[in-house]
Amino acid sequence: MILYFFNTLILNFLSKIIMAYKPNMEDIKNLRTMTGAGLADVKKALTESEGDFNKAMEIIREKGQAIAAKRSDRETSNGCVLVKAVEGFAAIVALKCETDFVANGADYIKLTQDILDAAVAAKAKSLDEVKELTIADGTKVQDAVVARSGITGEKMELDGYNFIEGDNVEVYDHMGKHTLCTMVQTNKAAQEQGHAIAMQVAAMKPVALNQESVPQSVIDEEIRVAVEKTKQEQVQKAVEAALKKAGINPAHVDSEDHMESNMGKGWITAEQVAQAKEIIATVSAEKAANLPEAMIQNIAKGRLNKFFKESCLLNQEFIQDSKLSVADYLKAADKDLTVVDFKRFTLAAE
C-alpha cells in the first residue's frame, strides 16, 4: 500500500514535468519584441505563466517595478534628450538613467522617441500628461519606463518636457548626441535663420528672450549682487593700496593661512602681519562707510547691462558673427523677423 502511494506521487510528479509548458522560440521572440526584456527573463515569465502572454507581460512589469523601487535613491545624470517638430507643435523629451552605456542603447533611444512621438501627437502640455499617454505598442508611458528600468537594472525617470505651440519652429539636437536639444520659434517662416538661432541657444544658454521678459525678481537679485560685488571691489582696492604704501605685499596677507605660511617661509615678519591686520580692519571700515553711492549704482548698472547682453537671446552676440547681435542678424535677413519663443534642455550640469 505504501509502495503504491509513493509510486503514484512519483508518477504525478513526472507527468507534471513532462506536461509542463516549455516556451518555444516563436513565443520567446514575440514576447521579447513586445517587452524588450532579456532572453532569460522572457523564458522565465513564459514558463511561470504557462504561455499566457498577458500574465507573462505582467510578471515582467512587476519585476521592473521592484527594480525601480530598489534604485529610487540613485542619481540619474545620463539619459536621452530628443526633439521633434510637426505642423503647429514641437516638443523636447528627456528620459534620464544612470549610465551612458544604457543611454546610448538603441532600445533606450527608441523608447525616448516613442514617448516623444506620443507627446507630439497628443500635443501634450505637461510632463504629467505625457506620463499618462500611450505609446505605439499600447503601453502607458510610465509603465514602459518602469519596464525598461527592470530590463536594464537602472533607475530611470522621465525628467524633462518642453513644448512650443504654433508654426515656424526650428529644432536642433546638438551634435546629434541626444544630450542637448533646443527649439526656436520665429514670427514668420525662416528655416535658415531659425536653425542658426537654435544653435545659438544651445551654445550660449540664454535665460530670457529679451530684457523685457526677464522677471523683476531676477533683475532685483542681479542688481543686489552687482552692488555688493562693486562695494567689495572698491574696499579691496583701498586695502591693497594702503598695504603697498606700508611696504607690505597684499598677496602675502590676503588670508590667515597665507599669513601663517608666509611667516614660516620668512617672507613676512610677525610685526608686519600685525600691522597688515590693523590696516585691513581700519581701511575696510573707513572705505565701506564712505563709498560714493552714485558711483556704486553706475557700476552696478553697467554690470546689469552686461547680464542682459549675455543672458537675453536677442541681446547676445551672434556666434557666427560677433559684430552682430542676434536681433541684428535677424533684421539683416528680414527687417520684421524676430524670435518669439525658445526652449532648451540639457543633461549637463550648468
How should these model regions be labeled?
Residues 1-18:
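Short, Lys/Arg-enriched N-terminal segments with co-localized hydrophobic residues
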Residues 20-350:
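N-terminal assembly/interaction segments in proteins that build large macromolecular machines
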